[in-house]
Protein backbone atom coordinates (compact mmCIF):
# COMPACT_ATOMS: atom_id res chain seq x y z
CA UNK A 1 0.00 0.00 0.00
CA UNK A 2 1.18 3.53 -0.75
CA UNK A 3 1.55 6.40 1.63
CA UNK A 4 -1.54 8.16 2.87
CA UNK A 5 -2.02 11.46 1.05
CA UNK A 6 -0.54 14.39 2.92
CA UNK A 7 -1.78 17.92 3.03
CA UNK A 8 0.61 20.64 1.91
CA UNK A 9 0.79 24.06 3.53
CA UNK A 10 2.57 26.91 1.74
CA UNK A 11 4.13 29.64 3.90
CA UNK A 12 6.80 32.23 3.29
CA UNK A 13 8.74 31.78 6.53
CA UNK A 14 8.75 28.73 8.81
CA UNK A 15 10.28 28.72 12.28
CA UNK A 16 11.02 25.23 13.63
CA UNK A 17 11.00 25.28 17.43
CA UNK A 18 9.25 27.51 19.96
CA UNK A 19 12.20 28.77 22.00
CA UNK A 20 12.94 32.42 22.82
CA UNK A 21 15.21 32.91 19.80
CA UNK A 22 12.69 31.72 17.21
CA UNK A 23 9.86 33.59 18.91
CA UNK A 24 11.96 36.76 18.81
CA UNK A 25 12.78 36.17 15.15
CA UNK A 26 9.10 35.82 14.27
CA UNK A 27 8.24 38.86 16.37
CA UNK A 28 10.93 40.93 14.68
CA UNK A 29 9.96 39.91 11.17
CA UNK A 30 6.37 41.19 11.23
CA UNK A 31 7.12 44.89 11.93
CA UNK A 32 10.02 44.78 9.48
CA UNK A 33 7.65 43.69 6.74
CA UNK A 34 5.22 46.46 7.68
CA UNK A 35 8.05 49.01 7.60
CA UNK A 36 9.22 47.69 4.22
CA UNK A 37 5.71 47.97 2.78
CA UNK A 38 5.34 51.53 4.05
CA UNK A 39 8.56 52.48 2.28
CA UNK A 40 7.42 50.87 -0.97
CA UNK A 41 3.98 52.52 -0.83
CA UNK A 42 5.56 55.94 -0.35
CA UNK A 43 7.95 55.38 -3.22
CA UNK A 44 10.99 55.56 -0.99
CA UNK A 45 11.73 51.85 -0.74
CA UNK A 46 13.02 49.29 -3.20
CA UNK A 47 11.30 46.03 -4.08
CA UNK A 48 7.67 45.03 -3.96
CA UNK A 49 4.94 44.94 -1.36
CA UNK A 50 5.16 41.86 0.85
CA UNK A 51 2.29 39.83 2.28
CA UNK A 52 4.08 37.16 4.26
CA UNK A 53 2.59 34.02 5.72
CA UNK A 54 4.71 33.19 8.77
CA UNK A 55 4.36 29.96 10.77
CA UNK A 56 6.04 28.48 13.83
CA UNK A 57 5.84 24.83 14.88
CA UNK A 58 6.44 23.58 18.43
CA UNK A 59 6.50 19.93 19.48
CA UNK A 60 5.26 20.59 23.03
CA UNK A 61 1.63 20.80 24.10
CA UNK A 62 2.19 24.53 24.51
CA UNK A 63 5.09 26.81 23.68
CA UNK A 64 7.37 26.62 26.71
CA UNK A 65 6.14 23.20 27.82
CA UNK A 66 9.68 21.79 27.69
CA UNK A 67 11.33 24.72 29.47
CA UNK A 68 12.38 24.33 33.10
CA UNK A 69 11.57 27.19 35.47
CA UNK A 70 14.39 29.33 36.75
CA UNK A 71 16.23 31.53 34.29
CA UNK A 72 18.01 34.88 34.10
CA UNK A 73 16.72 37.05 31.29
CA UNK A 74 18.25 40.27 29.97
CA UNK A 75 15.45 42.44 28.49
CA UNK A 76 17.79 44.34 26.15
CA UNK A 77 16.52 42.43 23.10
CA UNK A 78 12.92 42.71 24.24
CA UNK A 79 13.27 46.48 24.53
CA UNK A 80 14.20 46.52 20.84
CA UNK A 81 11.40 44.17 19.81
CA UNK A 82 8.61 45.52 22.04
CA UNK A 83 9.47 48.86 23.65
CA UNK A 84 6.15 48.74 25.53
CA UNK A 85 6.59 45.17 26.78
CA UNK A 86 5.88 46.20 30.37
CA UNK A 87 2.37 47.23 29.30
CA UNK A 88 1.68 43.88 27.59
CA UNK A 89 1.48 41.70 30.69
CA UNK A 90 5.18 40.78 30.79
CA UNK A 91 5.27 37.73 33.11
CA UNK A 92 8.58 38.37 34.89
CA UNK A 93 8.62 40.91 37.70
CA UNK A 94 11.61 39.94 39.85
CA UNK A 95 14.65 42.05 38.98
CA UNK A 96 18.13 40.94 39.99
CA UNK A 97 18.83 42.88 43.17
CA UNK A 98 22.14 41.22 44.00
CA UNK A 99 24.55 39.26 41.84
CA UNK A 100 27.48 37.32 43.28
CA UNK A 101 30.10 35.29 41.45
CA UNK A 102 31.84 32.97 43.91
CA UNK A 103 34.68 30.50 43.96
CA UNK A 104 33.56 27.74 46.34
CA UNK A 105 35.77 25.54 48.48
CA UNK A 106 34.62 22.47 50.41
CA UNK A 107 33.14 24.47 53.29
CA UNK A 108 33.44 28.10 52.24
CA UNK A 109 34.47 30.27 49.34
CA UNK A 110 35.37 33.75 48.22
CA UNK A 111 33.43 36.34 46.27
CA UNK A 112 35.03 37.36 42.98
CA UNK A 113 34.94 41.17 42.67
CA UNK A 114 32.90 42.57 39.80
CA UNK A 115 35.90 44.67 38.80
CA UNK A 116 37.37 41.43 37.47
CA UNK A 117 34.13 40.62 35.65
CA UNK A 118 33.06 43.75 33.75
CA UNK A 119 30.22 41.95 32.00
CA UNK A 120 28.65 41.15 35.39
CA UNK A 121 27.75 44.79 35.96
CA UNK A 122 24.83 44.48 33.56
CA UNK A 123 23.15 41.74 35.55
CA UNK A 124 21.17 44.26 37.58
CA UNK A 125 19.05 44.89 34.48
CA UNK A 126 18.09 41.24 34.28
CA UNK A 127 14.96 39.47 35.43
CA UNK A 128 14.69 36.16 37.26
CA UNK A 129 11.70 33.94 36.66
CA UNK A 130 10.01 31.14 34.77
CA UNK A 131 11.31 30.52 31.27
CA UNK A 132 8.11 28.60 30.55
CA UNK A 133 5.96 31.65 31.34
CA UNK A 134 8.26 33.86 29.28
CA UNK A 135 8.02 31.59 26.23
CA UNK A 136 4.25 31.33 26.54
CA UNK A 137 3.93 35.12 26.75
CA UNK A 138 6.20 35.59 23.73
CA UNK A 139 4.03 33.12 21.81
CA UNK A 140 0.96 35.22 22.62
CA UNK A 141 2.72 38.32 21.25
CA UNK A 142 3.74 36.43 18.13
CA UNK A 143 0.20 35.20 17.47
CA UNK A 144 -1.18 38.70 18.04
CA UNK A 145 1.23 39.90 15.33
CA UNK A 146 -0.34 37.49 12.83
CA UNK A 147 2.04 34.53 13.00
CA UNK A 148 0.50 31.04 12.90
CA UNK A 149 1.69 28.99 15.89
CA UNK A 150 1.14 25.21 15.69
CA UNK A 151 1.60 23.41 19.01
CA UNK A 152 2.03 19.63 19.30
CA UNK A 153 3.59 19.68 15.85
CA UNK A 154 6.98 18.04 15.49
CA UNK A 155 9.18 18.35 12.42
CA UNK A 156 10.43 14.89 11.47
CA UNK A 157 11.96 15.36 8.02
CA UNK A 158 13.41 18.15 5.92
CA UNK A 159 11.89 18.48 2.45
CA UNK A 160 14.26 18.97 -0.46
CA UNK A 161 13.74 20.01 -4.06
CA UNK A 162 16.85 18.59 -5.70
CA UNK A 163 19.71 20.32 -3.87
CA UNK A 164 17.57 22.95 -2.16
CA UNK A 165 15.70 22.74 1.09
CA UNK A 166 12.05 23.65 0.67
CA UNK A 167 10.37 23.02 4.03
CA UNK A 168 9.64 20.47 6.72
CA UNK A 169 7.38 17.43 7.04
CA UNK A 170 5.58 17.16 10.38
CA UNK A 171 5.05 13.93 12.27
CA UNK A 172 2.04 11.66 11.91
CA UNK A 173 -0.48 11.73 14.76
CA UNK A 174 -2.54 8.87 16.16
CA UNK A 175 0.21 6.25 15.84
CA UNK A 176 0.57 3.33 18.27
CA UNK A 177 3.87 2.56 20.02
CA UNK A 178 4.35 -0.38 17.66
CA UNK A 179 3.77 1.75 14.58
CA UNK A 180 0.15 0.82 13.91
CA UNK A 181 -2.48 3.41 13.10
CA UNK A 182 -5.12 4.33 15.66
CA UNK A 183 -8.67 5.32 14.78
CA UNK A 184 -7.67 8.97 15.03
CA UNK A 185 -4.65 8.59 12.74
CA UNK A 186 -3.71 11.72 10.84
CA UNK A 187 -0.73 11.92 8.47
CA UNK A 188 1.71 14.76 8.92
CA UNK A 189 1.69 17.89 6.80
CA UNK A 190 4.30 19.04 4.31
CA UNK A 191 4.98 22.67 5.24
CA UNK A 192 6.72 24.31 2.28
CA UNK A 193 8.56 27.56 2.94
CA UNK A 194 10.76 30.01 1.09
CA UNK A 195 12.79 30.59 4.27
CA UNK A 196 13.12 28.09 7.12
CA UNK A 197 14.68 28.97 10.47
CA UNK A 198 15.79 26.10 12.70
CA UNK A 199 15.72 26.79 16.44
CA UNK A 200 15.59 23.24 17.78
CA UNK A 201 18.25 23.60 20.43
CA UNK A 202 21.89 22.51 20.61
CA UNK A 203 21.53 19.12 18.90
CA UNK A 204 18.30 19.19 16.92
CA UNK A 205 17.52 16.23 14.68
CA UNK A 206 16.63 18.30 11.64
CA UNK A 207 19.48 20.75 12.17
CA UNK A 208 21.97 17.88 12.30
CA UNK A 209 20.55 16.46 9.07
CA UNK A 210 21.02 19.84 7.42
CA UNK A 211 24.56 20.20 8.78
CA UNK A 212 25.61 16.78 7.50
CA UNK A 213 23.92 17.14 4.11
CA UNK A 214 25.59 20.44 3.31
CA UNK A 215 28.84 19.68 5.21
CA UNK A 216 28.50 22.82 7.30
CA UNK A 217 31.01 21.59 9.89
CA UNK A 218 33.75 20.75 7.41
CA UNK A 219 36.95 22.65 8.16
CA UNK A 220 35.59 24.01 11.43
CA UNK A 221 36.46 23.11 15.03
CA UNK A 222 34.08 20.53 16.50
CA UNK A 223 31.17 21.93 18.49
CA UNK A 224 31.46 21.36 22.23
CA UNK A 225 28.49 20.84 24.54
CA UNK A 226 27.63 20.97 28.22
CA UNK A 227 24.99 19.23 30.29
CA UNK A 228 22.87 21.31 32.63
CA UNK A 229 20.66 20.02 35.44
CA UNK A 230 18.28 22.21 37.39
CA UNK A 231 15.87 21.93 40.31
CA UNK A 232 13.11 24.29 41.38
CA UNK A 233 12.87 24.28 45.17
CA UNK A 234 10.02 25.62 47.28
CA UNK A 235 11.09 27.01 50.65
CA UNK A 236 8.74 27.84 53.52
CA UNK A 237 10.90 30.59 54.96
CA UNK A 238 11.41 33.91 53.22
CA UNK A 239 13.81 33.09 50.42
CA UNK A 240 16.14 35.48 48.66
CA UNK A 241 14.11 37.09 45.87
CA UNK A 242 16.30 38.82 43.34
CA UNK A 243 19.54 37.14 44.42
CA UNK A 244 21.54 35.58 41.57
CA UNK A 245 24.56 33.45 42.46
CA UNK A 246 27.00 31.90 39.98
CA UNK A 247 29.72 29.58 41.26
CA UNK A 248 32.90 27.86 40.12
CA UNK A 249 35.12 25.46 42.03
CA UNK A 250 33.48 23.02 44.44
CA UNK A 251 32.10 20.43 43.87
CA UNK A 252 33.86 20.11 40.50
CA UNK A 253 37.48 19.09 40.27
CA UNK A 254 40.15 20.92 38.27
CA UNK A 255 39.63 18.65 35.24
CA UNK A 256 35.92 19.43 34.82
CA UNK A 257 34.76 22.64 33.16
CA UNK A 258 31.57 24.05 34.64
CA UNK A 259 29.87 25.71 37.56
CA UNK A 260 26.65 26.20 39.46
CA UNK A 261 23.93 28.79 39.92
CA UNK A 262 21.28 29.72 42.46
CA UNK A 263 18.44 32.13 41.63
CA UNK A 264 15.93 33.54 44.10
CA UNK A 265 12.83 33.67 41.91
CA UNK A 266 10.39 34.96 44.54
CA UNK A 267 9.73 34.74 48.27
CA UNK A 268 9.27 30.97 48.21
CA UNK A 269 11.00 29.56 45.11
CA UNK A 270 14.70 29.09 44.42
CA UNK A 271 16.24 27.56 41.28
CA UNK A 272 19.51 25.69 41.75
CA UNK A 273 21.50 24.13 38.94
CA UNK A 274 24.82 22.81 37.70
CA UNK A 275 26.34 22.96 34.21
CA UNK A 276 29.31 20.78 33.20
CA UNK A 277 31.16 20.49 29.91
CA UNK A 278 30.58 17.11 28.28
CA UNK A 279 34.30 16.66 27.59
CA UNK A 280 35.12 15.23 31.02
CA UNK A 281 37.27 12.09 31.11
CA UNK A 282 36.13 10.68 34.47
CA UNK A 283 33.82 7.67 33.89
CA UNK A 284 32.38 8.15 37.39
CA UNK A 285 31.33 11.74 36.73
CA UNK A 286 27.61 12.32 37.40
CA UNK A 287 26.26 15.85 36.95
CA UNK A 288 23.13 15.13 38.99
CA UNK A 289 25.27 13.88 41.87
CA UNK A 290 27.40 17.02 41.63
CA UNK A 291 24.25 19.13 41.89
CA UNK A 292 23.29 17.34 45.11
CA UNK A 293 26.75 18.07 46.52
CA UNK A 294 26.38 21.73 45.54
CA UNK A 295 23.02 21.90 47.33
CA UNK A 296 24.66 20.70 50.56
CA UNK A 297 27.30 23.43 50.50
CA UNK A 298 26.84 25.80 53.49
CA UNK A 299 26.60 28.87 51.26
CA UNK A 300 23.84 27.37 49.08
CA UNK A 301 22.07 25.87 52.10
CA UNK A 302 21.29 29.31 53.46
CA UNK A 303 18.93 29.81 50.51
CA UNK A 304 17.30 26.36 50.23
CA UNK A 305 17.49 24.74 53.69
CA UNK A 306 14.34 22.76 54.45
CA UNK A 307 12.99 23.23 50.94
CA UNK A 308 11.17 20.73 48.74
CA UNK A 309 11.96 20.01 45.08
CA UNK A 310 8.83 20.74 43.05
CA UNK A 311 10.29 20.51 39.51
CA UNK A 312 13.49 19.37 37.84
CA UNK A 313 14.98 18.91 34.43
CA UNK A 314 18.11 18.54 32.33
CA UNK A 315 19.28 19.91 28.99
CA UNK A 316 22.32 19.99 26.75
CA UNK A 317 23.83 23.40 26.01
CA UNK A 318 26.21 24.60 23.29
CA UNK A 319 29.57 25.88 24.48
CA UNK A 320 31.86 28.26 22.65
CA UNK A 321 34.89 29.04 24.78
CA UNK A 322 35.45 31.93 27.17
CA UNK A 323 34.63 34.82 24.85
CA UNK A 324 31.48 33.19 23.46
CA UNK A 325 30.22 31.38 26.52
CA UNK A 326 31.27 32.94 29.80
CA UNK A 327 30.10 36.57 29.63
CA UNK A 328 26.45 36.08 28.62
CA UNK A 329 25.05 34.49 31.78
CA UNK A 330 21.73 35.80 30.51
CA UNK A 331 21.58 33.70 27.35
CA UNK A 332 17.84 33.97 26.61
CA UNK A 333 18.12 37.70 25.96
CA UNK A 334 21.18 37.25 23.75
CA UNK A 335 19.47 34.50 21.76
CA UNK A 336 16.45 36.74 21.19
CA UNK A 337 18.65 39.57 19.99
CA UNK A 338 20.70 37.47 17.57
CA UNK A 339 17.72 35.76 15.93
CA UNK A 340 15.89 39.06 15.68
CA UNK A 341 18.81 40.48 13.72
CA UNK A 342 18.92 37.43 11.45
CA UNK A 343 15.24 38.03 10.69
CA UNK A 344 16.08 41.64 9.85
CA UNK A 345 18.76 40.54 7.39
CA UNK A 346 16.32 38.09 5.82
CA UNK A 347 14.09 40.99 4.83
CA UNK A 348 16.75 43.56 3.96
CA UNK A 349 19.53 41.63 2.25
CA UNK A 350 18.04 39.87 -0.73
CA UNK A 351 16.50 36.69 0.61
CA UNK A 352 13.83 35.33 -1.74
CA UNK A 353 11.10 37.12 0.24
CA UNK A 354 12.26 40.46 -1.15
CA UNK A 355 14.02 39.51 -4.36
CA UNK A 356 11.85 40.33 -7.35
CA UNK A 357 14.39 38.88 -9.76
CA UNK A 358 14.38 35.39 -8.27
CA UNK A 359 11.96 32.66 -9.14
CA UNK A 360 8.96 32.86 -6.81
CA UNK A 361 9.41 29.17 -6.08
CA UNK A 362 12.94 29.63 -4.76
CA UNK A 363 13.78 28.35 -1.29
CA UNK A 364 16.35 29.40 1.23
CA UNK A 365 17.31 28.64 4.78
CA UNK A 366 18.84 30.42 7.71
Each model region followed by its residue ranges:
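N-terminal FAD cofactor-binding segment of flavoenzymes
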Residues: 28-33, 39, 43-108
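Glycine-rich Rossmann-fold phosphate-binding loop(s) that bind the pyrophosphate
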Residues: 18-20, 59, 131
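Predominantly flavin-linked oxidoreductase catalytic cores and closely associated redox partners
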Residues: 31, 48-50, 132, 136-137, ...
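Beta1/beta-strand and adjacent pyrophosphate-binding region of the FAD-binding site
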Residues: 4-21, 55
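A short, basic/flexible loop-to-alpha-helix module at the beginning of a structural domain
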Residues: 1-10, 38, 46, 179-188, ...
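FAD/FMN-dependent oxidoreductases across multiple families
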Residues: 256, 282-353, 357
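Active-site-proximal substrate-binding core of FAD-dependent oxidoreductases
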Residues: 43-51, 341-347, 359-366
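Conserved Rossmann-like nucleotide-cofactor binding loop
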Residues: 21, 62, 203
Amino acid sequence: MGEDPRQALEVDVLFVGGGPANLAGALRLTPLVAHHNQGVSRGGGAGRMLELQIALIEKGRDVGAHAVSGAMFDPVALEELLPDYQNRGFPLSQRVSRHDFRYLTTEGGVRIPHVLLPWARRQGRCYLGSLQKLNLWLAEQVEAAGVYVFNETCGVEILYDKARMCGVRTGDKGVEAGGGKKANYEPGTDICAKVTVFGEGPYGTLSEDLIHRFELRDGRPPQSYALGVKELIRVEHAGAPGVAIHTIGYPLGPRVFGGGFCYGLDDHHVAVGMVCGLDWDDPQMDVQAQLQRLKKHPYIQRFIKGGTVVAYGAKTLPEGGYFAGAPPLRGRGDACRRLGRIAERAVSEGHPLCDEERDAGGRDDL
